[in-house]
Amino acid sequence: MVDTDNDDLKSSTGSIGDLYAQKSSPKGGKPFHILGLHLKSKGIFEAYEWSKWWEKADANRKKILAQATQIRVKFLDPFLTDSTTSSPLIVCGDINDGPGLDACEKRLFGSGVERLMRMIWKPQLCLGNALFDTLSAKDKEEVDFSSIYTTTFKDPIFNDTYQREWIDHILYSKNQISEWVTGGQIHSKMPDGTPIYTRYKHASDHFPISVDINT
């Protein structure tokens, strides 16, 4: 249970259990670890009275924040500060949350992915974001993430309008001297240019993300 918004009420993290980072030893490179995540969905796909809808939306977001906080405090910080485990670390997966301040995030003063990425009092433990690194200098300066999205869906609340969301991330530790994670890409098409969803009708509605890793 975690107090996500300083209201003296604690939100359940659900079942996180033990977390383990898988060690990978690439040929010709130094070992690094990978932690794959899939946090609570924030989607609501049923009709509710408006105040009830907001209640459910806020509850989902609080659970994501609680899960992200537990992972940051109970796994990431200990892992990155332990001399026996402080090798390069990738944290990736469907975080089900993006950076920025949408309506719910304004109400809760934060997002799950930002909670995973940083603890402002421990800047040396902050994680980089591979897709943010690909933004133009102007978009970085203005903190404009609108060009990045990893899934699209019909929003039943707004007459099935297609929404674009950035909820899948590849984060990386900054405990290396050189840049070791580069070339972030979102893949919406097959190598021959065919959209993935037209080739594979039952594929995930999330686009694959890739990076180049050089340890």
Regions found by a protein language model. Give the residues of each.
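Metal-dependent phosphoester-hydrolase catalytic domains
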Residues: S12-S15, K23, D77-I90, I95-T215
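Residue-level signal for well-ordered alpha-helical segments
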Residues: Y48, K52-A57, A66, I148, ...
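A long, amphipathic alpha-helix that forms part
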Residues: E55-S83
